[in-house]
């Protein structure tokens, strides 16, 4: 039973890394700076509920932010998100 649980955890971690790592690589500029608008949505580590906005690659979308952690693809308003991330 313990081995199955461990293998399941390893599999889950592997899948998360396969999804997250390429997204982080593609968010990097040639000079090493990170384009925050290309980072994936990240609700953070806490359990509070703040309605925020992130850029999903084509539009600004609402999500619930936990209040701590996460990444910089997080904006207090749709307008702030669009101003930073929408390409004219």
Swiss-Prot record:
Coiled coil: none annotated. Residues 37-85 form the BPTI/Kunitz inhibitor domain. The record marks 47-48 as: Reactive bond for chymotrypsin. Gene3D superfamilies: Pancreatic trypsin inhibitor Kunitz domain (4.10.410.10). The keyword Disulfide bond applies. It is found in: Secreted. Keywords: Disulfide bond, Protease inhibitor, Secreted, Serine protease inhibitor, Signal. Residues 28-33 form a propeptide. Residues 1-27 form the signal peptide. Disulfide bonds join 37-85, 60-81. Pfam families: Kunitz_BPTI. Expressed by the venom gland. GO terms for biological process: envenomation resulting in negative regulation of voltage-gated potassium channel activity in another organism. One of its GO terms (cellular component) is extracellular region. Belongs to the venom Kunitz-type family. 03 (sub-Kunitz) subfamily. This is Kunitz-type U15-theraphotoxin-Hhn1g. The lineage of its organism: Eukaryota, Metazoa, Ecdysozoa, Arthropoda, Chelicerata.
